[in-house]
Swiss-Prot record:
Heterotetramer composed of 2 IpdA subunits and 2 IpdB subunits. Its EC number is 4.1.99.-. SUPFAM superfamilies: NagB/RpiA/CoA transferase-like. The gene is ipdA. PANTHER family: KETOACID-COENZYME A TRANSFERASE, SUCCINYL-COA:3-KETOACID COENZYME A TRANSFERASE SUBUNIT B-RELATED. One of its GO terms (biological process) is cholesterol catabolic process. One of its GO terms (molecular function) is CoA-transferase activity. Pathway: Steroid metabolism; cholesterol degradation. Keywords: Cholesterol metabolism, Lipid metabolism, Lyase, Steroid metabolism, Sterol metabolism. Disruption phenotype: IpdAB double deletion mutant does not grow on cholesterol or HIP, but grows as the wild-type on pyruvate. In the presence of cholesterol, ipdAB double deletion mutant accumulates COCHEA-CoA. InterPro entries: CoA_trans_fam_I (IPR004165), NagB/RpiA_transferase-like (IPR037171). It comes from Rhodococcus jostii (strain RHA1). Involved in the final steps of cholesterol and steroid degradation. Opens the last steroid ring of cholesterol by catalyzing the hydrolysis of (3E)-2-(2-carboxylatoethyl)-3-methyl-6-oxocyclohex-1-ene-1-carboxyl-CoA (COCHEA-CoA) to 6-methyl-3,7-dioxodecanedioyl-CoA (MeDODA-CoA). This is Cholesterol ring-cleaving hydrolase IpdA subunit.
Amino acid sequence: MVSKRDKRISLDDAVGELRSGMTIGIGGWGSRRKPMALVRALLRSDVTDLTVVTYGGPDLGLLCSAGKVTKAYYGFVSLDSAPFYDPWFAKARTAGEIAVREMDEGMVKCGLEAAAARLPFLPIRAGLGSDVRRFWGDELRTVTSPYPDASGKSETLIAMPALNLDAALVHLNLGDKHGNAAYTGVDPYFDDLYCAAAEKRFVSVERVVETEELVKTVPLQNLILNRMMVDGVVEAPNGAHFTLAGDSYGRDEKFQRHYAESAKTPQAWQQFVATYLSGSEDDYQAAVKKFAEEQA
């Protein structure tokens, strides 16, 4: 019998599989269960010129702060709590430093579904009653249904292009060494779709456990990734910080506000980078622990 592959790797090994110019999908939702440890590893790398597909939050903001992003496809970008709009994404967008493809949230899902099904596009009504088509120009087109309705009219729909990903980065709560992974809490977001739409798939988890423990700990419906959907598993405790991570921990609101405040001046941001983003993931976690103690 062939044994199942052990897919455990380090953060830097995962990012080492990425290349400049790639299109990457980042799972989670706003400031919720983002693969922040993988994002921080990406910040430490030489990878740049990225196209990012995301329901965005500080993941996209941090990558913009380091000049890593050339283009972004997103349904929204939010910190979910005050000040709500990510400061670094806002700066990059208003300064024209990145090309943006803003769209209805359902259009992102539709584009990922098309990519997962290896289809060039899928039809959708979302976007028809907005300026999305004008913003996208020739990149977004319509299609006429070949099936007339009861009145004999053929409906015009958005032909949402597949959001094909070179790589997907997601964070879940529990996983095994083979790539099976599950979330805890109330929402799967669309992490499974990101992985299904990507050529390379990397999941960070709060804990790597034995398969037997994994299937006993969570309901079957929470087990959204199976080993065929994952190429690398990274054990990263607190790896979604400062975003929330289901039942593992809530959003670090004080640190998120510190992040946003630090973006207001070059001096403050330089200090933030020196303190939190210039070392290893262990260095980051130690600095975050010190910050929490000082704020207590």
